[in-house]
Regions:
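Alpha-helix boundary/interfacial micro-motifs
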Residues: 34, 63, 124, 143-144, ...
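N-terminal intrinsically disordered, low-complexity, charge/repeat-rich segments that act as generic
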Residues: 1-80
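Non-DNA-binding regulatory cores of transcription-related proteins
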Residues: 81-144
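Short beta-strand-centered aromatic/proline hotspots
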Residues: 103, 153-156
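Short, compositionally biased
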Residues: 108, 155-159
Length: 159
């Protein structure tokens, strides 16, 4: 798989997400500052709730912008079957007969993108799965423990 094209697909999706988030933040800001948002009594919290929402939206916008900068300057490395998994590796794993694709990047964990007919999810090296994959190779098993649950991911391919 061409990881440079994958990064471009992620950036395109994030730019679209950013546009939607900015529009939503503007609408929330307008709602928070609108005259109708002034409290009618001591129990009326519409304006306060709108201001909390605006703050959360501003944080999300900042996170997307930060990830876009990281992706713009990302040094995408090429990995082969004998290479150890590290940052910018695209990894195909099998868990319970299902194949999944993970792209390891320092930020943006949980972002999903459709690419070449597959769903690719960003995983950070500090996430449980990201930590389990670090320094493994094709054919190895990544073990992720979550409470009393143990998941084993077989590494099928690395790009």
């Amino acid at each position: 798989m061409d990881k440079k094209k994958l990064v471009e697909a992620i950036r395109t999706q994030l730019e679209n997400d950013l546009s939607v988030a900015k529009q939503a933040a503007l609408a929330t800001y307008e709602a928070a500052t609108h005259e109708e948002s002034k409290p009618e009594n001591e129990y009326d919290t519409r304006g306060l709730e709108a201001s909390y929402l605006a703050g959360a939206q501003a944080k999300r916008i900042s996170e997307i912008e930060e990830l876009l900068v990281i992706l713009k300057h990302l040094d995408v490395k090429t990995f082969g079957p004998g290479d150890k998994i590290n940052s910018t590796a695209l990894v195909e794993v099998e868990f319970n007969g299902k194949h999944s694709f993970f792209f390891i990047v320092v930020k943006g964990g949980g972002v999903n993108v459709k690419f070449e007919g597959r769903t690719v999810q960003i995983v950070t090296p500090s996430s449980p799965l990201g930590e389990a994959l670090q320094d493994l190779r094709q054919g190895d098993i990544a073990v992720v423990e979550n409470g009393d649950q143990v998941r084993e991911y077989e590494i099928i391919n690395i790009w």
